[in-house]
Amino acid sequence: MKITLPEFEKARVLVVGDVMLDRYWHGPTGRISPEAPVPVVKVEHIEERPGGAANVALNSAALGAHAVLLGLTGQDEAADALAGQMAGVKVACDFVRLADYPTITKLRVLSRNQQLLRLDFEEAFHDVDSTLLMGKVEQALPHSDVMILSDYGKGALNDVPSMIQRARAAGIPVLVDPKGTDFEKYRGATLLTPNMSEFEAVVGKVKSEEELVAKGLELVKRFELEALLVTRSENGMTLIREGQPELHLPAQAHEVYDVTGAGDTVISTLATSLAAGKSLDEACALANTAAGIVVGKLGTSTVSPVELANALYTEQETGFGVMSEAQLKIAVQAARLRGEKVVMTNGCFDILHAGHVSYLANAGKLGDRLIVAVNTDESVRRLKGPGRPVNPTERRMAVLAALGAVDWVVPFAEDTPQRLIAEVLPDLLVKGGDYKPEEIAGYAEVTANGGEVRVLNFEDGCSTSDIIKTIRERG
């Protein structure tokens, strides 16, 4: 499956659930306490991160989505710290603050990147009036593309059925990271993301792939779900739907340092990708890739679009296809992190011929990645006159993207790609024809950035205009 990143910034993600504050105390250990047989940690660094549902929202925001977080907290210092953390990453929070409860806080003591102890400060919100949070959900739903229910069993989601019903009535998909064995409360959700332990706690021990799929389908039917995504640690993840073959995605992690928050990354990437327009299969593939990245980090962490692009666009792959400008910028950043040389060219490419193919092949040999910027239909008409282009923008870009020499294809609406070139700033800008380098659009911007501009020769005897003329004469 060839995947490109969606425009995550268009996604509006509503996260509702058990919010937490994760605290980390880091320091060396060099002796045993004289008071008890335990190591003494000299705390040198204190760190705070959003946890639980807050980490889910943080992951969506890290991808570029507009994230809104709803949950229950206390009226305490930890709630203020959590709100400050979320404001810093531009997550809109609307908490129900309760005087008689502490904000759920987990304090971890670490030495040499090894966790020695965890202290939990919490009291489950089981007796809280569910209408307090439901009112905020109803206000947020009209401004959301997807809703995530992040259930850690702490009491914020004590009326899940009503939340699912309201969201589905509004046409908004609901993705649930479940907790416990009572899946009845998730009836009617779009998709559940249990891990293997949670799945087997509901259906019993699974002994084969066939049994996994069969029992997964039973859950899909029984609880009126659209899909079930079972995350299986080192065995990847499996998407199960009624009427379609299962989709198995192998694990992507190269090294596993910490699985803390990996489930949060999976559901947030999945939901954000769906909200940004990706299919369920594509969204699951992106979530699987994100999970492989995040388990290589210590503690609850996030994945950026550049990291995701870097993992998707490996050195061996090519032909990633048509992209928007936003997607292209992320892909270029990822390429540069890998030390790759980015080459860029542009043109109408109305009727692709041997001259074009030869030119693009030569351009591609000059670097590691080749970007082709293509004039839109309106731009071509202004430059070439009535009757052009023969092929619309989408078809021209699709043909170019299929060429082995071409990595990324992007449209531009202006007469020249100068603005786009200034945004991308390729290492090498090439153009075919009889130009002088300084006459080429984007020359000043590229050279000022330390890049190079080069003119390549076109193959003689190949011309789109001549091809069109010949067709008309013979027609």
Curated annotation (Swiss-Prot):
One of its GO terms (molecular function) is heptose-1-phosphate adenylyltransferase activity. Keywords: ATP-binding, Carbohydrate metabolism, Kinase, Multifunctional enzyme, Nucleotide-binding, Nucleotidyltransferase, Transferase. This is Bifunctional protein HldE. In the N-terminal section; belongs to the carbohydrate kinase PfkB family. In the C-terminal section; belongs to the cytidylyltransferase family. It catalyses: D-glycero-beta-D-manno-heptose 7-phosphate + ATP = D-glycero-beta-D-manno-heptose 1,7-bisphosphate + ADP + H(+); D-glycero-beta-D-manno-heptose 1-phosphate + ATP + H(+) = ADP-D-glycero-beta-D-manno-heptose + diphosphate. Homodimer. ATP binds at N195, M196, S197, E198. Catalyzes the ADP transfer from ATP to D-glycero-beta-D-manno-heptose 1-phosphate, yielding ADP-D-glycero-beta-D-manno-heptose.
